[in-house]
């Protein structure tokens, strides 16, 4: 069995070693460890491997809390201390900024920490009927596989939701369409839990009765989604209050649909908004754009600070809900929302937004390359706060801002939005030089 000394962790939380002149990425290994490993895939310049025995363990290694860790693909870093996880993610961010963007921040912000367990307020879990494995399987996908890990508990889900998993197995197993129900989406607000069942066939009256009884017994709302996300609708109870989460620091309540995009970690979301607005420093009289604004997660706190906010989002339905949230919170007088494809942004389309003193960008994993390239003398805000869920595209966009558009990267840091996983959420501040 080959042996390696692990030098560092990569962006997926794998140990990195060099053996006989070749890079080996070792799952389950930590920096500083000596491990035995098995190669499961070979490439000309690197191997992919899995640790089979830890010969010399890192002081940062901890016992995984979940019985499914190592099989389930939902988590990849439960074997690493939570503080060390954040430090590893900070290194991933700094490495990306330098190696991809050739930029370094003036300062590194302290990592934003929150609860390490029970934090996941949004999840999509798979459902499969596999008689050879005992019937219904419910869980995240297995590591490196399209198969479903059969989860009976999950410590990154809130305890009440994790505790429902055994009953959920029994419920699905009794439905007539169990083999035509590929996923269940979990969406949690401050006061309500919604389970959205993706049903590929209509339910029978008996199925609906079982689902309604489950909803009543467990204190959740059950929705059905027979088609695209827009088809999702409540089954039981009818007429329940909409899901919502609050941002108490800004006296804002955000209503949302269970299939809308919201951050999975409400505690980190609140802290990330606080950090973002500290850096953005919105003031009365300023006009600030929130690009990729979604439901108005950043827009409404900006407006609450007295600035006028212009929210832009690709989804027309989200734009309507953002405007509705602004009205509900009494902020419609300082906010406006527009639907536009920001992946096709141009100098003219940005200029059409009017004077912008500052900019907040919170794009999906693809980043905001069209937006940063479209910045010009027509639209050149003095300060940009960039919230990112992908260090590589943040670094790519930072290169354009710094090397082509005349901005300075004042600071950058991570928010541990997804503890126990390798996902890196980050924030960066750019100022016009």
From Swiss-Prot:
Catalyzes the formation of 5-methyl-uridine at position 1939 (m5U1939) in 23S rRNA. Keywords: 4Fe-4S, Iron, Iron-sulfur, Metal-binding, Methyltransferase, rRNA processing, S-adenosyl-L-methionine, Transferase. Belongs to the class I-like SAM-binding methyltransferase superfamily. RNA M5U methyltransferase family. RlmD subfamily. HAMAP family: 23SrRNA_methyltr_RlmD. GO terms for biological process: rRNA base methylation. Signal peptide: none annotated. Its EC number is 2.1.1.190. Residues 1-53 form the TRAM domain. Gene3D superfamilies: 2.40.50.1070, Nucleic acid-binding proteins, Vaccinia Virus protein VP39. This is 23S rRNA (uracil(1939)-C(5))-methyltransferase RlmD. The active site is at residue 389. InterPro entries: 23S_rRNA_MeTrfase_RlmD, MeTrfase_TrmA_AS, NA-bd_OB-fold, SAM-dependent_MTases_sf, TRAM_dom, U5_MeTrfase_fam. The gene is rlmD. Pfam families: TRAM, tRNA_U5-meth_tr. PANTHER family: 23S RRNA (URACIL(1939)-C(5))-METHYLTRANSFERASE RLMD, RNA M5U METHYLTRANSFERASE. S-adenosyl-L-methionine binds at residues 263, 292, 297, 313, 341, 362. It catalyses: uridine(1939) in 23S rRNA + S-adenosyl-L-methionine = 5-methyluridine(1939) in 23S rRNA + S-adenosyl-L-homocysteine + H(+). It comes from Aromatoleum aromaticum (strain DSM 19018 / LMG 30748 / EbN1). [4Fe-4S] cluster binds at residues 66, 72, 75, 154. GO terms for molecular function: 4 iron, 4 sulfur cluster binding; iron ion binding; RNA binding; rRNA (uridine-C5-)-methyltransferase activity.
